[in-house]
């Protein structure tokens, strides 16, 4: 069995798309296991750039194709838009598989997301308003509409009518908003069901069969561990489990079928939206990192908050997700800096701690304790091997590995697939 689960080890936007693209060239099957179209990644293929929110990168190269599994919530309009864009560019999409157990994001989920965020006022969490949270809410309430329902017009009509009665009561009586029309939604979405039906199957069987044959299976995690609904900075989190355990359940496989958990991290830290961020920079250094690295959200376009590398948060991610290898991205950003800082612990009301508190109040009171390292002058974007990196850059990478207790297996020195230095092949771990 050869399998890798790629997980974001920070607050998302760590460069998972690049690493999954890099590993996807040698993977036999690529699987998306959680989240929805709130998570964007950019893939460069055959000289063209593709911005994807739902379809895994394996659609481009993997022998067995790409899977959208049961843990994903699917906006069929977004999905079909991505499929159309791929097909217009000559990409074969026939090898896409969609789980019959995945839940569907409905128009009322998007409206509910918007209304609830507006009603929260100062307590809003910065949702992307794509309906992700309300869809997972309905899933947990056991009233959600799944792919297998959408492709059965009779079942779909029954479940839509049941849900819309309740949503319209909520919209009109609580939020003072207009009701939504059954016929309009049904006619639009039943057509979506017809168009995606050919891709639908029991993806749990498909993925497990591939693992049984010892195919190389790449599981593409979305968001980041610090956005996990249980282990992240609650309530400023996503609505799904982004840890490796969530990838297992979201793919319909046993947890012991994931061989390597590859944590993706930047040489610094970023976050989009509200929520605690102990190492955040509010000075020229933060602005400099943001400008050099073009730190703006793939989906939202919002400027990302920037801070120094936080080893406390990463050790937390290691513990709860079982990370046993690291891919360190954007090392090239620090060329020309005088110094780099790594947060090694927190000061919480005069006490040094090395763990990430659950209490939001405690996290906000934490002050980072830094270790300072010298940066390097050289441009490293052309480095092809470990030996090509300056000694100071090597020292920084080694220190990250020492502090976190995780071996660094790849180092990224630029956005292109070729700008990836492999210290150890993740498929051989």
From Swiss-Prot:
Its cofactor is Mg(2+). Binds 1 Mg(2+) ion per subunit. GO terms for biological process: 'de novo' AMP biosynthetic process; IMP metabolic process. Pathway: Purine metabolism; AMP biosynthesis via de novo pathway; AMP from IMP: step 1/2. GTP binds at residues 12-18, 40-42, 304, 330-332, 412-414. Its EC number is 6.3.4.4. It holds the Pfam family Adenylsucc_synt. Mg(2+) binds at residues 13, 40. GO terms for molecular function: adenylosuccinate synthase activity; GTP binding; magnesium ion binding. Its main location: cytoplasm. It is found in: Cytoplasm. PROSITE patterns: ADENYLOSUCCIN_SYN_1 (PS01266), ADENYLOSUCCIN_SYN_2 (PS00513). It catalyses: IMP + L-aspartate + GTP = N(6)-(1,2-dicarboxyethyl)-AMP + GDP + phosphate + 2 H(+). It comes from the Bacteria. IMP binds at residues 13-16, 38-41, 128, 142, 223, 302. InterPro entries: Adenylosuccin_syn_GTP-bd, Adenylosuccin_syn_Lys_AS, Adenylosuccinate_synth_dom1, Adenylosuccinate_synth_dom2, Adenylosuccinate_synth_dom3, Adenylosuccinate_synthetase, P-loop_NTPase. Belongs to the adenylosuccinate synthetase family. Homodimer. Plays an important role in the de novo pathway of purine nucleotide biosynthesis. Catalyzes the first committed step in the biosynthesis of AMP from IMP. This is Adenylosuccinate synthetase. It comes from Lactobacillus delbrueckii subsp. bulgaricus (strain ATCC 11842 / DSM 20081 / BCRC 10696 / JCM 1002 / NBRC 13953 / NCIMB 11778 / NCTC 12712 / WDCM 00102 / Lb 14). The lineage of its organism: Bacteria, Bacillati, Bacillota, Bacilli, Lactobacillales. The gene is purA.
